[in-house]
Structure formats: structure tokens, C-alpha cells
Amino acid sequence: MKRVTQKRAIQSVIIFASFTIGIPALAESISDPPPVLEPSDPNGKRVLFDNSHGQTAGQSDWVIDGAFSDFADALVENGYYVKEHRSAEPLTSADLDGYDVFIIPEAQIPFKAIEQEAIASFAEEGGGVFFIADHYNADRNFNRLDSNEIMNGWRRGAYDDITKGMSNEEKEALEGVVSSDWLAEEFGVRFRYNAIDHTVADTIVSPEEAFGITENISALSIHAGSTLAIIDPNVAKGVAYLPDGLTPEANKWNNAVDQGVYHGGGMEEGPYAAIGKKGLGKAAFIGDSSPVEDATPKYRNEEHGGTKRTYDGFIDQDNGVFFVQVVDWLAEQESYTNFAEAGIPLDEPSPLLEMELPEKTTEPQAEPWRQPQGDYRWYDRSTFAAGSFGSGQEAPLEVEYDLETPEALPLGGQTFSVTVELRHLEPNQTVNSLDMQVYLPGGRSISQIQGEDGSWPSSYGYHQIGTLTADATGTATKTVTMRLNPSVEADSAMIRLRNDRQNVVTQTVALTAASEKVTKHPTIQKSLKRKSVPVAIAGS
């Protein structure tokens, strides 16, 4: 017999494509010790990753033991001590004390004025800050603010009142947040609110004009991201640009709320990645989190508890090498306070559309872009789904689906047995929403399932397999009799099991014209590689 095992959260709102294996979620609260990564050959430099401003909201999982682990591991391999910052209290200078670089991945909760002051002071006194943003309207927790707005310091269409349209509870959660053109005033750049896709940043400033940051860099990937506007060329400089000739028709993100492309790409669109100098310290900026992430998310979605899906961006193009070189530059203190003193060519200020001026902006469409599901509220961790960061509750075990078939399904209308087994149900739980079919490439249905009364359906396609009831251990098993359309002549097909019309198992099966003895094979166990992450005893 041929057997395949799949795992699914039976109550999950989102189920991804066939053979996506559920990732075990280790729920942690904001008060749990943060992860720490220590190098075997330390270079004496310390890096702090922020996880106190919604970095795990929605499908994001921007933590050093989750979907930013490739980045963190690469830094550790280069000698950096890496830690996550997690706290329910505002960020302070004391939190940043002792660190060389502070990395802010795609924040979803605004910084209070005292936090902005702490970040600016950290840079002024010699620290390096790396701002990782995304595209406009990448609002993952439905608080009407995306990372570009948060890092800029002001909300599009609400420059005079950043809490415009919010509930009293939301306004209370944002006490101490003040609207201002903070990033431009402190660091000389502003994240644009564009949303660009279907291209690559392959116009790279030479290493000689970029302090070596772009050494061996030919291209950086972008998957729905933004660019920056250079406001003060004395302290801000682009290092990677998108191509010229971009158009809204070809290059705007599919869900962009405006034209998406503001200046046709190239230099006028502004840099995709940039660097900055502030006092004794430095800054770096990039308009997309996609090139930083990897495919190992740790937590569940805080809104609905679904399994997250992230992508291997860090290993795409020259992304990984670039980000490590950015941190190398940020961690090195240098005495010049502006780029003119450093003797490199200065950029021109970026052109701005009138609608990009903070006081002239309008809200292109109502925010948030949709209402949250259920009782989820971004400001109340007690509403976060089990398995998400901040919930403190372990995610329920995912239902495991086991499908056992003959090694080859017989043709010619001959009957055969298929056994379906579900594990990790509640004891005595019943499931009556399963159906199954065999189909050919291209989608032609070729199977029937015999009813419990011995009758056969009049058509080929999906058919219910009946009710399964779990035993005391949460396991339910049912064997059904099937047959294929006798007119079929093929060597292989697909068998698919669905639960409530959602695909849970899809497997290739061989077809044979003759009756053959079949043998039972052991269950295919698909395991997930889990990263072992040292955890601080006290105290990302």
C-alpha cells in the first residue's frame, strides 16, 4: 500500500496549496526571555533586532528565530552577537545601550515620540540603525498604519492627526505618538508611499562611492516594495535603484491604491536602498522586507491563528551578502558627520509629487483595507490567536491526514480500497465534511466512491466518504471502496482528499491495467527542520 501523511489545522481560516506542511508554533508572551544568538568567533559587535512594534503581525514573522533567522544566522557567522528586543514598555536609550546596530524590521505599531528620540540619539552618539520598510498599505494589523508611515512619522491623509478615525481604545494605545516628518528631519530621507513590483533593483552604486557596501552586488530583489526620497543629500545617499522605464501598467503592485509608480523608476523614483549619516552614527534603509525574509516562520497569525507562509528572499539575488555588508558598515564608527566630509559624490534631492508632501497627502481609500476577523484587536494581546507571538497560548495540534492507497490503482473498473485516517482530533469528535476523487492531469475526474448501502454514484468526481468518529486518542479511520472509469487509459493520476472543500492531501498515484499484488509501505513521515536557538536566561 502507498501511504502519505499530511498535517492541517482543521480550524485554520487559510489553508495553503497541497503538501504545505503545518509549522509547529511555539507561543511566547512579551514577558518571556528573548532569543539570543552568540557567535563561536565573536567580533565584539552586538546587534539588536526590534520585536516590540508589531513585527509578527499578520503574515510577517520578522524575528531572529523565525523568518529573519537566515539574516540573524549570517550575522552570527560573521561574529556578531544577536539578540531580540521585546518589551511592553516604550523603547529607551537604556534598551539600546551596549549595542552597535539596531535593526527595525517593518514596524506595525507606531513609535512614541520618546522612542523616536531614543533612536535618533542612539545614532547621533555613534550607533547604526537599519530601517526595513515595505510598500504603502502593508497594514498587517489593521491599525491604519503601515511601516513606511510609521518610520516616516506621519500617516498619509492624516498628517495633522495620526489617530484620525480611530476608536478611543486605539487612541489610548497610541498615547505619546506624535505626527511629524521625523525621518526626513532626523535622517534626511523619506519612505515613499509607492508600491512597485515585477522588477529588480539592478542599478547599483559603485563600492567606491558606497563605502564598500555594494562590493560584489549586482542586483537586489523586490516583491511589492517602495523606494525612498532623498531629502538632504548631505546625510542621505542611495546605493541601489530600480530600472528606468517602469510603468503603472507593468510595475505597480496588484493591490496598489494609487498609480504605484511615481516617477517612472530609475534615479527619479528614488533609491530602493539607501544609507545615511547622523552625527557619529549611521543609518540604512530599504523599501521592502521580502529580500530579508526566509521560509521558516515561527509563529501563527495573530489575527486568526493560521499558519504563516514566508519566502526565501534572503538567498535570492545578492540580498544576503548585501545585508551583511550593510551591517558591517553600520557597526563601524567613523568620525565624518556628513557625506561631503567623506569625499563621495552627493545625490541630488529626489523630485516629489505634490501629493507626496506630508501636509498635502490624502487617503486614497478608506482604512483599514479590511476589518479584522472575530474579536482580534491589534492593541489587545488577549485577543491574539493561540500560537501567535504575544498570546502566550500554544497553538492546537494540527490535524494529521493519512491516506493509504494501493501502490497502483487498477484500471478497467476494478474496485480498490483507500483508507483515510485523521489524527489529533478531539476525543469522540465527528468529521463528515471529507470528500475525495482521482483525476487526470488537466482535471478530468475519473473516480467513484461506493456508498455505504453498496450503491455507486451516477457520475465521476468528488464524493463524500461518510462520517468519521475519533476514538479516545483522537484518531479516526475509515476505509472506502473506489473504482475508476473503465474507459480511462493512462499511466498515472492524482488522488485528492478535501475537508470542507479545502485541499488537504494531493498525491500522485500510478495506474495499472492488470490486477497486481500490492504491499503495504510504512507511513511517509515529513519532518520539519527546527532551528536550535539559544535563549537568554533573563532579559529581542
Spans of model-derived segments:
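Catalytic beta-strand/loop cores that center a nucleophilic Ser/Cys/Thr
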Residues: 181, 188-294, 410, 414, ...
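A glycine-rich, often tryptophan-bearing local segment used as a flexible ligand/cofactor-contacting loop or short
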Residues: 110-210
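Sec-dependent N-terminal signal peptides of Gram-positive bacterial secreted proteins and lipoproteins
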Residues: 3-27, 539-540
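Glycine- and acidic-residue-enriched helix-capping/strand-helix junction motifs
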Residues: 55-68
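Solvent-exposed loop/turn segments at secondary-structure junctions
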Residues: 53-56, 88-91, 103-111, 129, ...
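Extracellular ligand-binding/catalytic regions of CAZymes and related secreted enzymes
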Residues: 28-45, 258-539
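Mature catalytic domains of secreted/periplasmic carbohydrate-active enzymes
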Residues: 27-50, 65, 94-97, 174, ...
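A short, well-structured beta->alpha microelement
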Residues: 75-92
